[in-house]
């Protein structure tokens, strides 16, 4: 393996000013490049460990395979930069502009990306390890397919319209994050904190939300078909119009959740806590609600055809205008349940 070429900062800047752009595989350890313009420079494979590049302009720069560990790129402009396969340990990228940049295959460990702009960036297969900071980061339209962000701090991050297929966000903190219209197919969000997060109109098919905290989350119109929500907390979540066909909601806490017009056909809701939940107009065709707690729940106009409610607690529930044809209500608690105009399991209408 060839020895990295060493060059002084002044010499590099002089050669750059003369029109040279290729500085691949050079060594610039602890170099100081603050507030310098190096647009379109080729620093692929360069060693920039501990370099100071605060406010540096690196638009369209090639930093692929570069070593940027312990470097400070705070407020640097890296628009459309190539950081494919770069290594960054404890790198500071606070409020840097990485919009349109490619970080595919890059490894970032304990990196500070607070307030960074990653709009439209490509992070396919990128690894952000050991609790990297992405607080208030902007990732609008970014591609994070198969990225590893387990345990990442992403409070208040904006991921609207981003592609997150097969992403690993297990244990990540996404409190208050916005994920409107994201594609999150087959993602791993087990143990993630999504308290107050906005996932409205998102496609989240076959994703794992096991023991995730979705308290107060906005999931209106979201497609959660086949999602695993086992052990998740959805207290106060808004699931109006959400598609939860075949979803695993076994034993879930959905207390006071808004599930109006939601599609819960064939969903597993065994033992779920739906106390005070709003299920008005919801589709619960062939859903399994055995032993579920539906105390004071609103099921007005809900479709409960062929639904299993064996042993469920429906005390004080509103079943007005609901359709219960073929439903199983054996051993269910119907104390103080209102059933005005309800179609009973045998097809008769309750008066």
Range-by-range predicted roles:
Residues 2-351:
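Tandem repeat scaffolds
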């Amino acid at each position: 393996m060839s020895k990295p070429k060493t060059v002084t900062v002044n010499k590099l800047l002089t050669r750059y000013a003369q029109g040279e752009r290729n500085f691949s595989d050079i060594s610039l350890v602890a170099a100081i490049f603050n507030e310098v313009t190096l647009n379109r420079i080729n620093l692929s494979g360069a060693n920039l460990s501990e370099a100071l590049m605060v406010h540096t302009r690196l638009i369209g720069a090639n930093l692929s395979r570069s070593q940027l560990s312990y470097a400070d790129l705070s407020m640097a402009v890296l628009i459309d930069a190539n950081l494919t396969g770069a290594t960054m340990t404890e790198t500071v990228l606070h409020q840097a502009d990485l919009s349109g940049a490619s970080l595919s295959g890059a490894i970032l460990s304990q990196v500070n990306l607070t307030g960074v702009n990653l709009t439209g960036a490509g992070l396919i297969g990128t690894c952000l390890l050991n609790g990297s900071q992405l607080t208030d980061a902007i990732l609008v339209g970014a591609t994070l397919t198969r990225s590893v962000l387990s345990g990442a701090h992403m409070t208040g991050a904006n991921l609207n319209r981003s592609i997150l297929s097969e992403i690993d966000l297990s244990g990540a903190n996404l409190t208050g994050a916005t994920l409107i219209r994201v594609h999150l197919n087959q993602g791993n969000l087990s143990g993630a904190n999504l308290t107050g997060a906005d996932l409205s109109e998102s496609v989240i098919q076959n994703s794992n939300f096991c023991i995730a905290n979705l308290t107060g989350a906005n999931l209106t119109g979201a497609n959660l078909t086949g999602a695993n929500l086992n052990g998740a907390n959805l207290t106060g979540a808004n699931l109006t119009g959400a598609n939860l066909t075949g979803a695993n909601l076994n034993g879930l806490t959905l207390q006071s959740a808004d599930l109006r017009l939601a599609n819960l056909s064939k969903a597993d809701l065994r033992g779920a806590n739906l106390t005070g939940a709003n299920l008005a107009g919801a589709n619960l065709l062939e859903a399994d609600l055995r032993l579920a707690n539906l105390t004071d729940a609103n099921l007005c106009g809900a479709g409960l055809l062929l639904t299993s409610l064996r042993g469920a607690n429906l005390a004080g529930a509103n079943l007005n205008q609901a359709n219960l044809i073929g439903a199983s209500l054996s051993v269910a608690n119907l104390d103080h349940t209102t059933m005005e105009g309800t179609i009973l399991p045998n097809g008769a209408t309750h008066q």
